[in-house]
């Protein structure tokens, strides 16, 4: 049993805890603690009720020091439950990971992300750390599960799980490159609104993000091309990316265009994705040609879902694809996959 602590109980932290149970991985992963500055009542409420993902199928209760995940659904049930320690500490070095015998910290704060931050968790008693965002370049490894998780080694103690968008697009790039050879590419990320945007116009260091999230399509900076280069160094300076935020609360679409070496048709491209989704990337990549819209991919655990009806090929070598992902739920599930891969690499 892998003993895990979650540092930061926001969108990703709560989805990670929920995914432990909904994926069936509670047989392999035990969440022993959650560190979050918010009050226990709010933590329990937002875990139980979620605007994007609906009501959690497990009953949640709490006291001032614990969250309880009940195995039964009855409001008055006295049956079995899992107890999770609640902490409210802002300094990593004060966290009682040693006393709690924590094997792995899932750091979902989005604040910490360099080697020194990870080592602080380890000094506090954790054995390993997995960050929920790309983090700094000095980490022991960056894992996009399904693509390079087999590169994990026992000595990789401070690891990044990449970003939701790298987890979405990197597996597709891998498939296309292995099948046809990629020369270069561009990506437009069409991303749901996030909590770094404003409900109504208000001050922000990024002037575009001073504007109300629900009223505009808002261009934002992205370092996605750097994330691709970190996984595939051979694509240094070969990809560029832009990103816009749209007025939805969840699910992201990625418009991928690549120039390839092989002369192909649409069916060649789509069949390659289908084959990967049924074999090497099963559970990571999915494929559909159904006439779906973004909300249909809400709560989908795959990293990427290719909409084959939108695949286009120009002059045999320019390929355009539309790739969907639930930027919260898919990523949370990959956090768990990577966590178990880190354990297996011991």
Swiss-Prot record:
Assigned keywords, A-Z: Cytoplasm, NAD, Oxidoreductase, Pyridoxine biosynthesis
Iron-sulfur listed as a keyword: no
Positions with a binding annotation for substrate: 163-165, 209, 222-223, 245
Highest taxon of the lineage: Bacteria
GO biological process per UniProt: pyridoxal phosphate biosynthetic process; pyridoxine biosynthetic process
GO cellular component terms, semicolon-separated: cytoplasm
UniProt key word Oxidoreductase: yes
Active site: 164
Catalytic activity entry: D-erythrose 4-phosphate + NAD(+) + H2O = 4-phospho-D-erythronate + NADH + 2 H(+)
GO molecular function: erythrose-4-phosphate dehydrogenase activity; NAD binding
Biological pathway: Cofactor biosynthesis; pyridoxine 5'-phosphate biosynthesis; pyridoxine 5'-phosphate from D-erythrose 4-phosphate: step 1/5
InterPro entries per record: E4P_DH_bac (IPR006422), GlycerAld/Erythrose_P_DH (IPR020831), GlycerAld_3-P_DH_cat (IPR020829), GlycerAld_3-P_DH_NAD(P)-bd (IPR020828), NAD(P)-bd_dom_sf (IPR036291)
Location in or out of the cell: Cytoplasm
Site (Activates thiol group during catalysis): 191
CDD domains on file: GAPDH_C_E4PDH
E.C. code: 1.2.1.72
List of residues binding NAD(+): 11-12, 327
Oligomer status and interactors: Homotetramer.
Purpose: Catalyzes the NAD-dependent conversion of D-erythrose 4-phosphate to 4-phosphoerythronate.
UniProt record similarity statement: Belongs to the glyceraldehyde-3-phosphate dehydrogenase family. Epd subfamily.
Full protein name: D-erythrose-4-phosphate dehydrogenase
Taxonomic lineage of the native organism: Bacteria, Pseudomonadati, Pseudomonadota, Gammaproteobacteria, Vibrionales
Gene name, Swiss-Prot/TrEMBL: epd
């Amino acid at each position: 049993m892998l003993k895990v602590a979650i540092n930061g109980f926001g969108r990703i932290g709560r989805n990670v805890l929920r995914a432990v149970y909904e994926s069936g991985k509670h047989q392999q992963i035990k969440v022993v603690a959650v560190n979050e500055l918010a009050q226990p009542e709010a933590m329990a409420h937002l875990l139980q009720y979620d605007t994007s993902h609906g009501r959690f199928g497990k009953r949640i209760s709490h006291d001032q020091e614990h969250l309880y995940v009940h195995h039964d659904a009855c409001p008055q049930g006295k049956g079995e439950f899992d107890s999770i320690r609640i902490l409210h500490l802002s300094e990593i070095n004060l966290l009682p990971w040693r006393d709690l015998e924590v094997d792995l910290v899932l750091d979902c704060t989005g604040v910490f992300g360099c080697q020194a931050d990870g080592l602080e968790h380890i000094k506090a008693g954790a054995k390993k750390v997995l960050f929920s965002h790309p983090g700094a370049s000095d980490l022991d490894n960056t894992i996009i599960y399904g693509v390079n998780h087999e590169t994990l080694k026992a000595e990789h103690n401070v690891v990044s799980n990449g970003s939701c968008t790298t987890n979405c697009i990197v597996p597709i790039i891998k498939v296309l490159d292995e099948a046809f050879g990629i020369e270069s590419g561009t990506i437009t990320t069409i991303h749901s609104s996030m909590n770094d945007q404003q409900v109504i116009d208000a001050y922000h260091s990024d002037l575009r993000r001073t504007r109300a999230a629900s009223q505009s399509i808002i261009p934002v900076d992205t370092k996605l091309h750097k994330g691709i280069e970190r996984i595939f160094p051979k694509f240094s300076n070969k990809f560029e990316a832009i990103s816009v935020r749209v007025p939805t609360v969840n699910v992201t679409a990625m418009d991928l265009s690549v120039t390839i070496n092989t002369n192909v048709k649409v069916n060649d491209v789509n069949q390659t994705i289908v084959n990967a989704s049924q074999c090497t990337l099963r559970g990571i990549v999915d494929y559909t040609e159904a006439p779906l819209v973004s909300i249909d991919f809400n709560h989908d655990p795959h990293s990427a879902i290719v909409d084959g009806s939108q695949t286009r090929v120009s002059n045999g070598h320019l390929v355009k694809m539309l790739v969907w992902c639930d930027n919260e739920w898919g990523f949370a599930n990959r956090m768990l996959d990577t966590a178990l891969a880190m354990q297996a690499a011991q």
